[in-house]
Amino acid sequence: MRQVSHSGRRPAPRAARASVRELIEQGARRLRRARVFFGHGTDNARDESAALVLHALGLSHADPAVYARRVGVRGQERVRALLTRRIEERIPAVYLTGETWFAGLPFYVDPRVLIPRSPIAELIERRFAPWLDARRIRRVLDMGCGSGCIAIACAKALPWAQVDAADLSAEALEVAARNVRRHRLGRRVHLVQSDHFSALGAARYDLIVSNPPYVGTREFASLPPEYRHEPALALQSGRAGLDSVRVLLAEARGHLRPGGALIVEVGNTERALERAFPQLPFLWLQFERGGGGVFLLGAEQLPADGAARPRRAGA
């Protein structure tokens, strides 16, 4: 006998449960249809959907069994709501989940800091081989540290080294401090609020690493809307995108020990930089996992403190 309600109506059928795997595929289709931009932690719709679905459900990607788990109505609603924010507000998924990975390590991020995505991660994982002898790197500076990901990854890869992490933004340093605590590196990673080298005194380093702002005014205006959620201070650097890099080139030698090195990511301003500084022997590093626009200069190859001058203004 079929059950009926006291009103004489049949009860509404239960909503169909869906597996986590099915929700991920559904989400990926939504993201592709919406033509969102990928590049802030993931480079495809399925990985982005997986990150959002698992976060909405409070599940870990490390457990393969979760993908077959069945999800009820409320869980599906949470997933749809998070995907809707990603699509309608164009918020990068990493800001919605608060979690990203860099050099094999997890980091907390929010809109106070740039989302880590630098190919420098690959250098750190290789301990800068074959270009540098890691055993001689005893003191490192991460200039423009943001979330602290480069500084922390260097400290993990070089457990004998002390690392300074400098940033102009007090808000960024708050995020970096949270990550330093998370990785229990308070005794080895030291945060400094500084406009480039201004607060570092006479400190000298074996290695200075930097992923500074390098986006020019015109390029910034043409970026996908996802970039508008990142701090402009961490992206823009003058009309041609070279303002911050010029400071690094002018002042880095005064903060490097003999035999030290400067490694800087400049993205697609590579050619503009070479035109502006034709006298500098930039070594452009290659990456197995893709990416580019990262140069290395030895301390002795850099101009004397304050002597770096571009060939023409606004180059």
What are these regions (language model features)?
Residues S5-A103:
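N-terminal auxiliary segments of SAM/dcSAM-dependent transferases
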Residues I24, S49-A50, V79-R80, S147, ...:
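A general structural signal for well-ordered alpha-helical segments in protein cores
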Residues A34-G39, R127-R135, L256:
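Alpha-helix termini
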Residues A45, V113, G241:
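Short, conserved glycine- and acidic-residue-centered signature motifs
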Residues V66-Y67, V73, E77-W160, A166-V175:
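SAM-dependent Rossmann-like transferase core, predominantly class I methyltransferases
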Residues E125, W160-Q162, A166-A315:
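S-adenosylmethionine
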